C-alpha cells in the first residue's frame, strides 16, 4: 500500500530536480511508503537521462511537448497509487522529515483538505507560501507591480507552531488526499497559472479547510522552470488571471481586469522594445509581452482555450 505519491513536473531543471529527489530519499523514513512520479515536459537538458541513471526506481512520464504544469500534474495524478498526493516543484529541497509532518497532520485533522509547509529561500528568508483570494484591487496592484500597497497579501512571517487556516497555499508544495483531488477532477487545465488558487477555492466550497503548517520547511528556489521560457511564463500568468476571474468573479470585474492588462501589455511592449538591444533578457520579455498582446487580441482568455 502506497501512502504518498509525490508528483514533480520537470522542464529543463536537471540541476534542481536531481537534488530535490535526493533530498526526498534522504529525509523520508522507511515507515512511509511512497512513490515518486516525474512528468517531464520534453526537457532538452538531459534531465530524463540523469533521472533514469540515478533513480531507476522512480516513474517518469515523457511528454513529447511542454503541456504545462497543470496538465502534467493531472497526468501524474492519473497513475498515482498513493492515498495522498504531494505535488512538488522540482526546485524545492527537503531539510527535514517534512513528509511525515504533513502526512501525520492530515491523518489527524480530517476536516483539513490541503496542507502546505513553510517555504524558504537559500538564505532562510520566508517566502510567500499562502495567499488570500484575489480581489480586483489586489490583482490590479499586483499586475502593475504595486504589491507594496497590497493589503491582500499574506502574513509571510507567521511562524507559530500551530497551523494557520488560509484561503490558498502555494502549488509548489501542495499536500492533499487523492480522493479530494479526484472529487474535484484535478487541477483546472484551462489554467496555466493560479491553478492552486482555483483548486483551493473549489475545495473550500465543499467544506474543506486549507492549512499552512509553519513547523516544517522546504527550500524553494522559485521559478527555475519558468525562467527558461519567458514567452510562456508571461502569457500564462496574465491570461490565467483573466480566466480565474471569469470563473470566480462578475463580468464587470472581468472587463476591468482585461482592460488593465491590455494597457499593461502595450506599455511593456513599448519600453522593452526600446531596451531589447541592450540585453537578451529584455528581448525575450519583449517577445513574451508581444505574444501576450496577440493572444489578448484573439481573446485567448476564454475558458476552454
List the predicted regions and their residue ranges.
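Short aromatic/hydrophobic "clamp" motif used to bind/position activated sugar donors
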Residues: 85
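Short, acidic, metal-binding catalytic loop of nucleotide-sugar glycosyltransferases
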Residues: 22-33
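Conserved donor NDP-sugar-binding/catalytic core segment of glycosyltransferases
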Residues: 93-129
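Short, flexible, basic/aromatic active-site loop/helix in glycosyltransferases
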Residues: 134-166
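Glycine-rich, basic loop-to-helix element that forms the pyrophosphate-binding segment
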Residues: 62-80
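Non-catalytic, C-terminal membrane-associated alpha-helical segments of glycosyltransferases
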Residues: 232-240, 252-305
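A conserved acidic beta->alpha catalytic loop
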Residues: 23, 40-49, 65, 95
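A short, conserved alpha-helix in the catalytic core of glycosyltransferases
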Residues: 161, 167-186, 190-217
Amino acid at each position: 500500500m502506497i501512502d504518498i505519491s509525490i508528483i514533480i513536473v520537470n522542464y529543463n531543471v536537471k540541476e534542481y530536480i536531481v537534488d530535490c529527489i535526493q533530498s526526498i530519499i534522504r529525509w523520508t523514513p522507511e515507515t512511509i511508503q511512497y512513490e515518486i512520479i516525474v512528468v517531464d515536459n520534453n526537457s532538452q537538458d538531459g534531465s530524463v537521462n540523469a533521472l533514469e541513471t540515478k533513480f531507476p526506481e522512480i516513474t517518469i512520464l515523457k511528454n513529447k511537448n511542454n503541456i504545462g504544469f497543470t496538465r502534467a500534474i493531472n497526468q501524474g495524478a492519473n497513475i498515482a497509487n498513493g492515498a495522498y498526493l504531494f505535488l512538488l516543484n522540482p526546485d524545492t529541497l527537503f531539510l527535514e522529515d517534512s513528509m511525515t509532518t504533513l502526512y501525520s497532520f492530515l491523518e489527524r485533522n480530517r476536516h483539513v483538505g490541503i496542507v502546505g509547509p513553510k517555504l524558504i529561500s537559500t538564505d532562510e528568508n520566508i517566502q510567500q507560501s499562502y495567499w488570500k483570494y484575489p480581489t480586483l484591487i489586489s490583482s490590479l496592484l499586483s499586475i502593475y507591480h504595486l504589491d507594496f500597497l497590497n493589503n491582500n497579501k499574506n502574513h509571510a512571517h507567521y511562524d507559530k507552531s500551530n497551523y494557520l487556516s488560509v484561503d490558498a497555499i502555494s502549488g509548489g508544495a501542495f499536500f492533499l488526499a487523492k480522493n479530494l483531488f479526484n472529487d474535484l477532477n484535478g487541477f483546472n487545465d484551462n489554467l496555466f497559472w493560479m491553478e492552486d488558487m482555483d483548486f483551493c477555492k473549489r475545495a473550500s466550497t465543499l467544506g474543506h479547510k486549507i492549512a499552512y503548517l509553519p513547523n516544517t520547511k522546504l527550500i524553494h528556489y522559485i521559478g527555475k522552470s519558468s525562467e527558461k521560457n519567458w514567452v510562456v511564463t508571461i502569457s500564462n500568468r496574465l491570461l490565467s488571471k483573466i480566466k480565474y476571474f471569469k470563473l470566480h468573479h462578475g463580468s464587470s470585474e472581468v472587463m476591468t481586469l482585461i482592460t488593465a492588462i491590455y494597457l499593461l501589455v502595450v506599455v511593456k511592449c513599448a519600453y522593452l522594445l526600446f531596451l531589447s538591444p541592450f540585453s537578451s533578457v529584455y528581448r525575450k520579455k519583449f517577445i513574451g509581452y508581444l505574444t501576450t498582446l496577440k493572444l489578448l487580441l484573439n481573446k485567448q482568455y476564454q475558458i476552454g482555450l
